[in-house]
From Swiss-Prot:
Catalytic function, reaction form: cytidine(1402) in 16S rRNA + S-adenosyl-L-methionine = N(4)-methylcytidine(1402) in 16S rRNA + S-adenosyl-L-homocysteine + H(+)
Lineage: superkingdom: Bacteria
Protein's name in the database: Ribosomal RNA small subunit methyltransferase H
Record function comment: Specifically methylates the N4 position of cytidine in position 1402 (C1402) of 16S rRNA.
Gene transcribed to yield this protein: rsmH
Organism listed in the record: Streptomyces avermitilis (strain ATCC 31267 / DSM 46492 / JCM 5070 / NBRC 14893 / NCIMB 12804 / NRRL 8165 / MA-4680)
Amino acid sequence: MSQSRHVPVMLQRCLDMLAPALTEPGAVVVDCTLGLGGHSEALLTQFPEARLVALDRDKEALRLSGERLAPFGDRATLVHAVYDELPDVLDRLGVPRVQGVLFDLGVSSMQLDEADRGFAYAQDAPLDMRMDQTTGISAAEVLNTYPPGEIVRILRAYGEEKQAKRIVSAIVREREKEPFSNSARLVELIRDSLPQAAKRTGGNPAKRTFQALRIEVNGELSVLERAIPAAVKALAVGGRIAVLSYHSLEDRLVKQVFAAGAATTAPPGLPVVPERYQPRLKLLTRGAELPTEEEIAENRRAAPARLRGAQRIREDAE
C-alpha cells in the first residue's frame, strides 16, 4: 500500500473547523480513527504547539502510521484502542480534557487496498472484515452461523438493503452446500439473487451487503453510539469536534448527539432559561457538509462523505 495514494477526505475543511481550538500551546487533539495517519500528520504540521493522541483498533494501521508520524517525536501518542475506549485512554494518559476531536469513520484506504482483509467487493478475498484481526468474529462466521432472520435484520438495518430476504434465502441455501469463505462467491450470489431493476441502481449490487456485514463484524454503530457522547464529554469549553461519516446511519447518529447538545433542556414556558438548561454545544455546520466536486474527482472515496462539527460552549450541568 503506497502511502502517496492515501488521500485524507475533506482534509482542509477538517483542519479549518478544528483550528480555532488548537492554536494555544499545549492543546491536545484526538484523532479517534488514525488509519494511515493522513489527518494526524496534517494536524501536527499545521498546529506546531499541539499534542496528538491517536487511536486505532488495527495494529497494522498503527505500525504504518507510527513510521509516518515518527518525525513528530513525543508530540504524537499512538494507542491501540477502539474509539469508544476514549475515556479510559485519556484517563491512562492523565489528560482530563482535550481541545479537539476528529473522527473519520468507515474503512481506511489501507484496509480496502489490502485484498486479504476482505473489505472490498471488487476483488476475491477471505471474508474477514475485522478491523482488529486479533479479536471478534469474521464476516464468514456471520454468514455461516447466524440465523436467517438475524442476517435479514442486519442487511436491512445496516445496509438499508431492500432485497435482504432474497439475498438471505440464497445465502442459507448456499451455506448448507458449503460454508462461505471468500468474497467472490458472495458477490456472485448477490448478483444472481437480485431482480434486474435492483441491479441498475447505486453501483455494485454487493455494496450494501458488504457494508452491513462490516458494521456487524466490528460493532460499528454501537461503538459510535458510545463514542460520540464520550468525545463531546472530553472536550474543554471552546473545544471542537469534527466527524466524517460515510453512510446515513452514522450521519444520523452524529446529528442526533450534536442536536441534543445544542438544544436547551429547559421545561417549556420559562421566561428566562437558567444556566443549567442552556445548550452545551454550538453547531459548526448547517446540516452536513459535502465534499466538493473537485475533491470527488481526485478521490472517489470521498464521494459519500458527510462532515458535521460542533463546539463546546458550556460545561455539562451538575
